[in-house]
Amino acid sequence: LISGHIEPTAGEIRLNGDEISGLRPFEINRRGLSRSFQVTNMFARMTVWENVRCAVLWATGHRYSFWKNVDSLPEVRERTAQILDDIHLMHRRDVPAGLLTYAEQRELEIGITIASGATVVMLDEPTAGMSHAETERAVSLIRRLTEGRTLVIVEHDMSVVFGLADRISVLVYGHIIASGTPEEIRRDPKVKEAYLGEEAH
């Protein structure tokens, strides 16, 4: 609903004070909201550099052209390089995205998500399928890259949620059973029963 992929049947959605209900996803993106998907979403045959560059071109209002030397645009080149440095994938810049490890693909997708300079970033299960070490690295990356932005994250791994969130809403079978600070959520008996299990007692 918020990102425009499903149109609301009632009510209104506001982003930075502006009504965005009914706008198309790319229009909402241009207004400052960017999101990732649970299923990795990128151009598998394009290189890491080209994937990020596409996102930067879109964000800066340039149209991608296969016959235009887009690398001649200094602001696009510099922004692309900065993002690759930020996500620690500069050394993989010439590798097709489809050949990256799963964890690297998720890191690339986070880079693509922030390329627009969005003030609101939505991430859907960003650590799903990762090892413990990969998850810790992803959480550190997300925390660093979303500093100064609003982060909305959907995640089943409660350690990830507690590591990133200032405020948490817990959803069970389509219903919010609790909302509050991480400490309030830790103490909530309904949350303990639904998610945290015996270790929370």
Predicted regions and their residues:
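Glycine-rich phosphate-binding loops of nucleotide-dependent enzymes
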Residues: 1-201
